[in-house]
Regions:
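Alpha-helical scaffold domains
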Residues: 1-223
Length: 223
């Protein structure tokens, strides 16, 4: 399927009201670069297109929805090396939180340690959404049975003036407080995050149904 054919399919699935709603959620996105395709339709189309080399290679894409489709396609690739290669190719063109968070390297779920060298590179990157993606991978794959104290240590060292990096850092620590409370609580008690991220972490943890009322009460004292 050519890029023009894919674009025609996307416009056939257009929902203008949804486009207008979605545009309000992504500051800085030019409405002219948004088509307005709902997520379930993008998922279906991603399965139909598959790992189409032509579409994936034609970067940058013109439309936000094409980037979303690209993220879904990469997420569905089962070969680990191919998936990683395509993600690395795509990351420099990711320019918003929605596309960044949409992409998941699910084929590494059983062996996420293979991603660690790449996660470290992403976190050390100067590109906002590479950093966000790296932290997101740590949150997705390394807060359960693959958890190690070195991972929150990595995230705690991030210092950025970028809202979408700091928000992901807060999201990571709030999720970690739900899953690895004892291990990550010292980061909050010792104020090892910058003040904004500390406050946002506590806010998100307090809003979470996965954090106990007892823990929430204590976290309120640490703002």
């Amino acid at each position: 399927m050519t890029t023009d054919e894919i674009r025609s399919r996307l416009f056939a699935l257009q929902d203008v009201k949804y486009r207008d709603f979605q545009g309000g959620l992504i500051p800085g996105m030019n409405p002219e670069n948004m088509i307005g395709v709902r997520t379930p339709e993008l998922r279906k189309l991603a399965k139909e297109v598959g790992a189409d080399g032509t579409f994936l290679a034609e970067l940058p894409h013109r439309y936000f929805d094409e980037n979303q489709l690209h993220a879904f396609i990469v997420s569905g690739i089962r070969d680990k090396q191919e998936c990683l290669r395509r993600a690395e190719e795509f990351l420099p063109y990711v320019d918003n939180w929605a596309t960044c968070d949409q992409m998941s390297l699910k084929c590494f779920k059983k062996s996420p340690e293979e991603l660690l060298p790449h996660i470290r590179e992403w976190i050390d990157s100067e590109r906002t959404y590479a950093v966000r993606f790296g932290v997101g991978c740590l949150m997705e794959f390394f807060l359960d049975e693959h958890f190690s104290p070195e991972y929150p240590e990595m995230v705690s060292k991030i210092r950025s003036g970028e809202y979408y990096v700091n928000m992901m850092t807060a999201w990571y620590f709030a999720t970690a407080l739900a899953k690895q409370y004892d291990a990550v609580l010292p980061y909050i008690e010792q104020h090892r995050l910058d003040q904004w991220t500390q406050r946002k972490t506590i806010q998100k943890a307090i809003e979470s149904y996965r954090v106990s009322d007892e823990h929430k009460q204590y976290l309120r004292t640490l703002k």
